[in-house]
Amino acid sequence: MKETYLHNKIFERNQTLTKAEYENCTFNGCNFADGDFSGFKFIECTFNDCNLSLVKLNKTAFVDAKFKDSKLLGLRFDTCNEFGLSFSFDNCMLNHASFYKTKIKKTVFKNCHLQETDFAEADLTNSVFDNCNLAHAIFERTILEKADFRSAYNYTIDPEMNRIKKAKFSVLGLSGLLDKYDIDIEK
């Protein structure tokens, strides 16, 4: 069976998607919550003000996908197709998402909520967490080399359990690197 290919299309609000390869498509205000995108391909697509919470992503391909003002609660990015996996997030809710063992170097998270998000064993080299809330996010054996946390907040990262060489942190965020020592740091 031949796979459907859609290029330069705009999808608005309540349109349903079928399994296909979507390239340079834009999705505006769509509610895909609890849907199944298994095997779908999204190449250079933009999602604006969309709800993808709890969507199944088994072998889903995201290549240079952009998410803006979107709700992505509980997504399992760790089940996506690894080939070319790349995306950026601007003003998105990614609480309870999983990036476990993903290789997503240079990913930009801007103004995002990433509470209880799992980054264990992920490669986030050169990634940026710009003004992101990382409360209870999981960083274990994560590669964070050259990552930028200067404006991120509420994170706890154990430098002994993660690779943080040349990562950038602000003075205000240093306490998040020392949490395991249970020391009082006064401002």
Feature-to-residue mapping (PLM):
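Tandem repeat scaffolds
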Residues: M1-K187
